Amino acid sequence: MEQEQDTPWTQLTEHINIQKKGNGQQTQKLGRPNLTRLMDHYLRIMSQVDMHKQTVSWKLWLSLRNPTQGSLKTRALKQWKSFNKQEWTD
């Protein structure tokens, strides 16, 4: 059976209780996830997503305030492509 790789998510969501058997081997028992740690992880991820969204919208706003020839060309091309897609679907 393939063993799961130890990722930050599995480290966060799994409590590993190591128990010794009589023959000296260690077994791992997966416990319930710690809800506080899960929520903390979720909030951190969502915060990073929000920061990314703010950065993207800020860059877009700056490009509209002070457009370069390249950014105008890119916007026009995107609008033309989306317009063509709508024509084909209508």
From Swiss-Prot:
The keyword Calcium belongs to this UniProt entry's keyword annotation: no
GO cellular component annotations of the record: host cell cytosol; host cell mitochondrial inner membrane; host cell nucleus; membrane
Composition bias, Polar residues: 1-29
InterPro entries reported in the protein's UniProt record: Flu_proapoptotic_PB1-F2 (IPR021045)
Intracellular or extracellular location(s): Host mitochondrion inner membrane; Host nucleus; Host cytoplasm, Host cytosol
Gene Ontology process terms (BP): symbiont-mediated perturbation of host apoptosis; symbiont-mediated suppression of host cytoplasmic pattern recognition receptor signaling pathway via inhibition of MAVS activity
Residue(s) at site: Low pathogenicity: N66
Chain segments carrying region Disordered: 1-31
Ranges for region Mitochondrial targeting sequence: 65-87
Miscellaneous notes: Is not encoded in all strains, and seems to be dispensable for replication.
Name under which the protein is recorded: Protein PB1-F2
Organism: Influenza A virus (strain A/Memphis/18/1978 H3N2)
Native organism taxonomy: Viruses, Riboviria, Orthornavirae, Negarnaviricota, Polyploviricotina
